Amino acid sequence: KSIFERDNRRDWLVIPDAVAAYVYETVNKMFPKVGQFLADAAQIPVIVGTRNFLIRETSKLSILAEQMMEKVKTLWNTKVLGYY
């Protein structure tokens, strides 16, 4: 499955999260102490807060983009193609 099918989220951080998970798994297999450092660093309040903020704001942008595309589609169907 693609990461979009596995991770049914609206935010735009799906790909960076998948890359980070892959990097973590690879590093953790080779250097467990460095892997533990990365895991600990990901839990620092500043990083968690920033990540949550980005998820929240990009979700809002995704919803607005979906609404705009729906309006454009409706406008196209009614004004250009003449459907009612």
Curated annotation (Swiss-Prot):
InterPro entries: Apo-VLDL-II. GO terms for biological process: lipid metabolic process. GO terms for molecular function: enzyme inhibitor activity; nutrient reservoir activity. Pfam families: Apo-VLDL-II. GO terms for cellular component: chylomicron; very-low-density lipoprotein particle. Keywords: Storage protein, VLDL. Belongs to the apovitellenin family. Protein component of the very low density lipoprotein (VLDL) of egg-laying females. Potent lipoprotein lipase inhibitor, preventing the loss of triglycerides from VLDL on their way from the liver to the growing oocytes. Monomer. This is Apovitellenin-1.
